[in-house]
Amino acid sequence: MKLSDIADNAGARKKRMRVGRGIGSGKGKTSGRGGKGQTARSGVRIKGFEGGQMPMHRRLPKRGFNNIFALDFVEINLDRIQQAIDAKKLDAGSVINAEALVKSGALRRAKDGVRLLGRGEITAKVNIEVHGASKSAIAAVEKAGGTVKLLAPAKDEGEAA
């Protein structure tokens, strides 16, 4: 058997239909696009238009609002902190806070604060300062001999008292 003997199975590759090549082809003149007008032209369709039927975005009611005072916490799991400690990017002896996590590369940014979650295990005795923590995360850190201190979220300067 040679490389030139290898071929596709019969019917595996269908030939492309050449449109606009005479009425005898069955795909001449309008090339299967129907009559004239907007739908015969190329380009972007009208977003959300459903052919005159009431579109989905108008059929469904408005719901909810965006709370401008909502705080956006970055979540980090215990296994990620343990990985950073094992890789010598975090010092288990010093306090682990948002600044230390960003500096070590465990987090990209701290946003409005950090929330500790309990996925994975932590074996190092660590002192963690975060803005929020799950019960399982606190229990796991304390089981390893460490502590979790919860901080108040940082308030904006322009916020009313």
Curated annotation (Swiss-Prot):
Keywords: Ribonucleoprotein, Ribosomal protein, RNA-binding, rRNA-binding. Pfam families: Ribosomal_L27A. This is Large ribosomal subunit protein uL15. Belongs to the universal ribosomal protein uL15 family. GO terms for cellular component: cytosolic large ribosomal subunit. Binds to the 23S rRNA. Residues 1-43 are annotated as: Disordered. Residues 21-37 have a biased composition (Gly residues). The keyword Transmembrane does not apply. Part of the 50S ribosomal subunit. GO terms for molecular function: rRNA binding; structural constituent of ribosome. The keyword Transferase does not apply. GO terms for biological process: translation.
